[in-house]
Each structure stands twice: as structure tokens, then as C-alpha cells.
């Protein structure tokens, strides 16, 4: 694993989507020493249970829960330090590239044969107005829908729901449903589909 941080550097509302590979997703989050130290400077204590406690609000570590241990230098040395050239070509998919590639059918963003070739226990597709179809579909595993542009109508036997950008919908396994834009204009949506890939190395 590598350490990474996230910051909204624009002026508009920002949202981050994190997808974990099911119940065997790698053993949880490992915190960089700087994160633990910065939290303490602001009166925050990170517990070994992964929860944050705010001393300014009178919170403290529960009985039996110690502070998150600070990672030692020998453990830090095992973490790779990737360059921009390591990361961008193999691990970044740009919105407008995905938008263009999904003009007639959904583009597989993360998957064995995706733009980002990986098998983390799920696949991610990107769907736009041009690649959306009214035909019903279902999946063996649960899926998740997250619009990023436009409003989308999700219909199934007995109901429907309209999703706006930033909304999230969990679709049960084996549920026949359709995914179509609900209004005119630009429309784009992420579809995350679980699969049977085991946890562990990608290949």
C-alpha cells in the first residue's frame, strides 16, 4: 500500500468515492505518522480501532482502546515511493477520456480488461447518455450506482427512483433494472459491480 491524501483544490463542491474489495480488502487503513501527529495538534486522538476522538468536545479513548500506534521507520521503509510517471499512466482515468469512450457503450474503467487493469474484487463501468439503454439488466452480485453528471432514473419491477449527482444507490443482486437519463443534457454515471475475484494479488 501507499500513503495518499485528498484535497479539493477547486471552488466547487467536491466528492470522493472510495471502493473497497469486500470483506477481504487488505486489513484496514494504515495511517502515516504525520496524520497521527497532526490530529494530536488539533486535539484529536486516533484510536487503535480506527475511530477519531475529539478532546475539545470532551471525548476520550474508551476503556480498553489505546491510541493508534505510530508506524515505525522500518515499516515505513517498506512502503513504495511512486513517481508521477509510475502513477498517472497506469492508475489515473480522466473524466473527459471516459466520457468520449462511452459514447456508444459503457466503458470499463477498472477491470481485468479495463482502462485501469486490475482485479480488486469489483469492476467499475462509466455510462453516459449515449451508452445508456432501457433494457433491463441484473447482476449476480450487488452493484452501486453513483451519478456524476445529470439526473438518472433507475427503474425496476414495482418502482423507480431518480438519482442526482452525488447520490448513491445500492442495487440488490439479481434485481432486473434499467439505468437511463431522467432529463435532457449531459449525463454520466459510475456503475460499480461486485464479482467473485478472490482477495490478494491482482494477477
Q: Can you name each region flagged by the protein language model?
A:
Residues 1, 129-132, 165-168, 172-176:
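Tight coil/turn sites that cap or link beta-strands
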Residues 2, 9, 138-165, 175:
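A short beta-strand-loop-beta hairpin characteristic of the jelly-roll/cupin
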Residues 3-80, 178-203:
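Double-stranded beta-helix
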Residues 18, 124-126, 144, 160, ...:
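Conserved hydrophobic/aromatic beta-strand scaffold that supports enzyme active sites
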Residues 44-135:
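A short, N-terminal "cap"/entry segment at the start of jelly-roll beta-barrel domains
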Residues 115-126, 138-144, 151, 187-189:
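Intrinsically disordered, low-complexity segments enriched in Gly and acidic/Ser/Thr residues
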Residues 135, 165-166, 192-195:
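Sequence termini and other peripheral, non-core segments
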Residues 135-136, 180:
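Beta-strand elements of modular eukaryotic interaction domains
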